[in-house]
């Protein structure tokens, strides 16, 4: 069984998040960069299966800037056998469509029986990458699973719905996405951290994947301008000298708030 886990470097949830007003992209220097927690949970699903099924190979795949290699290597420290990182300046600011095309090509290069990813990243929260990657790969999908069972020929799981829960099954090869209902990821130990330095880590470009991300090659969204939200006004302070109630009522009526 060859399992590919899609992981992503994101700004630390507990740090500051800022936009670069010149580029409209996230300011990567504003906070510490970490491996997305939902991606770690997806990796835990794969590693737990590998622990119980010797011979299973787990590979982490990510599309990220060159300096993100150290973050992605955490996946190797956790237990993945290898990593593949797509690095290319042309991918800065890539939309969901481009991201899905590139990740699908990277997954094909790595080889797979099952692809696992988180349902929502903590920065973009698009929630569609799993389905889009599956479409590009031409394989079944099962998304937003709160429980997963991996078999030799199929993968099944539980998806929460407004009416309760639905049981879904997909024949392998397939793509699935998981929710935060799945267990927390394991912590890398010292042995794993040291071993990660010697594990295969392949860095590829768009040319290596034979993917063209020129806007003319496929429909995509491009940010043309971004501006900072203007600060709120200071408001009006009412001092109570016996007539504060009347002043407040007049203010609410004037601004159509009452």
How should these model regions be labeled?
Residues 1-258:
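N-terminal glycine-rich FAD/FM-binding segment characteristic of electron-transfer flavoproteins
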């Amino acid at each position: 069984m060859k399992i590919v886990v899609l992981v992503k470097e994101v700004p630390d949830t507990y740090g500051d998040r800022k936009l670069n007003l010149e580029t409209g992209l996230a300011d990567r220097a504003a906070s510490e960069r970490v491996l997305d927690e939902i991606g770690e949970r997806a990796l835990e699903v794969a590693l737990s299966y590998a622990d119980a099924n010797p011979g299973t190979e787990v590979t982490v795949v990510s599309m990220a800037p060159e300096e993100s290699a150290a973050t992605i290597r955490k996946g190797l420290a956790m237990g993945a056998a290898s990593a593949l990182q797509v690095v290319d300046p042309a991918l800065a600011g890539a939309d969901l469509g481009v991201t899905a095309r590139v990740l699908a090509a990277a997954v094909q290069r790595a080889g797979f029986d099952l692809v696992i990813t988180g349902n929502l990243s903590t920065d973009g929260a698009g929630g569609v990458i799993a389905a889009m990657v599956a479409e590009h790969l031409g394989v079944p999908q099962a998304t937003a699973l709160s429980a997963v069972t991996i078999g030799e020929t199929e993968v099944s799981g539980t998806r929460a719905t407004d009416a309760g829960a639905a049981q879904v099954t997909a024949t392998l090869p397939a793509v699935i996405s998981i929710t935060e209902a799945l267990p927390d990821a394991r912590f890398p130990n010292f042995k794993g951290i040291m071993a990660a330095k010697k594990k295969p880590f392949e860095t590829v470009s768009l040319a290596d994947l034979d993917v063209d991300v020129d806007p003319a090659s496929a429909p995509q969204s491009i940010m043309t301008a971004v501006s900072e939200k203007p600060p709120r006004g200071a408001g009006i302070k009412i001092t109570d000298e016996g007539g504060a109630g009347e002043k407040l009522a007049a203010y609410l009526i004037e601004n159509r708030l009452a």
